[in-house]
Amino acid sequence: MAKSEGRKSASQDTSENGMENPGLELMEVGNLEQGKTLEEVTQGHSLKDGLGHSSLWRRILQPFTKARSFYQRHAGLFKKILLGLLCLAYAAYLLAACILNFRRALALFVITCLVIFILACHFLKKFFAKKSIRCLKPLKNTRLRLWLKRVFMGAAVVGLILWLALDTAQRPEQLISFAGICMFILILFACSKHHSAVSWRTVFWGLGLQFVFGILVIRTEPGFNAFQWLGDQIQIFLAYTVEGSSFVFGDTLVQSVFAFQSLPIIIFFGCVMSILYYLGLVQWVIQKIAWFLQITMGTTAAETLAVAGNIFVGMTEAPLLIRPYLADMTLSEIHAVMTGGFATIAGTVLGAFISFGIDASSLISASVMAAPCALALSKLVYPEVEESKFKSKEGVKLPRGEERNILEAASNGATDAIALVANVAANLIAFLAVLAFINSTLSWLGEMVDIHGLTFQVICSYVLRPMVFMMGVQWADCPLVAEIVGVKFFINEFVAYQQLSQYKNKRLSGVEEWINGEKQWISVKAEIIATFSLCGFANLTSIGITLGGLTSMVPQRKSDLCKLVVRALFTGACVSFISACMAGILYVPRGAETDCVSFLNTNFTNRTYETYVCCRELFQSTLLNGTNMPSFSGPWQDKESSLRNLAKCCDLYTSTVCA
């Protein structure tokens, strides 16, 4: 009876589910008779099939699984082997490139050396830092440290005196630049906020580091060649901007219009700096420079990081590196941060100045030399009298970029630079127009009392001439250099560098030095001194930029910022002037003198600086004896080509011997 009911229910369920196959119905009934449901049967068959397939796949994948586990156990060894093979391949490539043409491979060789140096520093710090600290423990002895300081300071003073005595014996005019440094130091000390609190260790260390670095990059042949090469590479690198500018604006505009020639360089350089910041390279370099300045000069971590950062970023971007610490900084530290901003230029505008034709190596040298000098003079003008919270370098950390990948960093850098380009263009338009208005007004006022040609530049040339002379500029060049220094301080450094580039272009194009009693260009030494003296944001318009940037970061310290900004402005300007004095002390003429006899014997038709110099030499060697046939002295004597060369020079330049 139960079985018949079971069959009936099974048939009903099957008919309800739409199953009309009798074979399936009989199988289902048989299984149900054994007390098993349909689901249990199905699951049993599926499990058997799954186990079979799983076992098969395990057997197939077993070699790959073993290989993966073997690699995971020896992953470190495999990475080292792969890295070693790549290093060997790169070393072979570098060796082949250097053997074929070392000059062509010099850039790659220098980059490789820098990478090796960075890796070596990381290795030494990781494995030998504690041992080095233990070795330096004896120096913590107060008496020993005092004697070491005295010996070192005495040796430095004696070395400086001997060097000045021997070096200035050949070029006594360099003593004028040394007197200029002393003059600026005395003026700043007289303006010091706390005379008795001045840390002379910081002052002398800062000036000493600036002087040593100046010797390396200006006086020594390897250092000069290295920075000259670096400047050339930067110029080549910045020239790639033309590709993008020409595509967007066209070749004609890029070649002839300043806005399309120089300003796009700021965008390109801003993009590159953003990439380097994303990779952490900028932070690494800033930290190393700040660490060195801190251990030598005894400054605190926050202010040192900000001043070191000013070598690469602008006066409003550098405080962002230490933004979390600005509220707790002392007045002396804030003064140092502001002075560093006024005393240096940003890496982004460095490219724009180079595009003007300004010497790249001088700009780079001036930017780096300004950092220790800015800290030194800042502590001279506003010494530390409070207790700082940032005496240990561990208390300050540099932030990393917020970008998630390198493409985002490049895009953000280019986009952010647009505001800087607009700012530069707007300032140039406004200040050149203001300068033209001021000159027109002064000229109108001067003509009222029969003073002709009175301009703002003329006033600066008289007022600032003694100061420029103390930097080491020859007296004949002082009026023009004083003009551009005045324009830089009262107007803008872009306008000043543009005027300096005009003087340089006139010299290189062979324009006569004097036309109608007015000097047209300045000497090479004066150009270098002027480049150093202009290398900074210390001008009156930068006061508003600095206050606006810092006030937005720490609005609660607005009164402190307003109290310090003018003092920091003049301190930053003096940093550039002392750097110019250093350049005046260390400058020596470079390059072999031109053999004018051989040079003029070539077919010259265009005016160049060498042509002008050689023609001047020929004019001075020409003697008029009251006859139509002049005679010649010096290297031009008894040369058949002298008369022919004299005629060519007279076609290009005017002289009394050409009459």
UniProtKB/Swiss-Prot annotation:
One Gene Ontology cellular component term attached to this UniProt record is:
brush border membrane
Q: Which Pfam families match?
A: Gate, Nucleos_tra2_C, Nucleos_tra2_N
Record comment: activity regulation? Inhibited by formycin B, partially inhibited by purine analog ara-A.
Listed transmembrane segments = 81-101, 105-124, 149-167, 173-193, 201-221, 234-254, 261-281, 296-315, 337-356, 363-382, 424-444, 455-475, 530-550, 568-588
Q: Does Transmembrane helix show up as a keyword for this record?
A: yes
Give the record's membrane topology.
Multi-pass membrane protein
Q: Which reaction does it catalyse?
A: adenosine(out) + Na(+)(out) = adenosine(in) + Na(+)(in); inosine(out) + Na(+)(out) = inosine(in) + Na(+)(in); guanosine(out) + Na(+)(out) = guanosine(in) + Na(+)(in); uridine(out) + Na(+)(out) = uridine(in) + Na(+)(in)
- Keyword set includes Phosphoprotein: yes
Ranges in coiled-coil conformation: none
Q: Could you tell me in which tissues this protein is expressed?
A: Expressed in liver (in bile canalicular membrane vesicles (CMV) but not in sinusoidal vesicles), jejunum, spleen and heart. Also expressed in brain and skeletal muscle. Not expressed in kidney, muscle and lung.
Instruction: List, in alphabetical order, the GO biological process terms annotated in this UniProt record.
Output: adenosine transport; inosine transport; neurotransmitter transport; nucleoside transmembrane transport; protein localization to cell surface; purine nucleobase transmembrane transport; purine nucleoside transmembrane transport; pyrimidine-containing compound transmembrane transport
Subcellular localization: Membrane; Apicolateral cell membrane
Q: List residues, modification Phosphoserine.
A: 46
InterPro entries recorded: C_nuclsd_transpt, C_nuclsd_transpt_met_bac, CNT_C_dom, CNT_N_dom, Gate_dom
Q: Show the segment(s) annotated as Disordered.
A: 1-22
Biological function = Sodium-dependent and purine-selective. Exhibits the transport characteristics of the nucleoside transport system cif or N1 subtype (N1/cif) (selective for purine nucleosides and uridine). Accepts purine, analogs of purine nucleosides and uridine, and exhibits high affinity for adenosine. May contribute to regulate the transport of organic compounds in testes across the blood-testis-barrier.
What family classification does the UniProt entry report for this protein?
A: Belongs to the concentrative nucleoside transporter (CNT) (TC 2.A.41) family.
What is the name of the protein in this document? Sodium/nucleoside cotransporter 2
Give the gene that encodes this protein.
Slc28a2
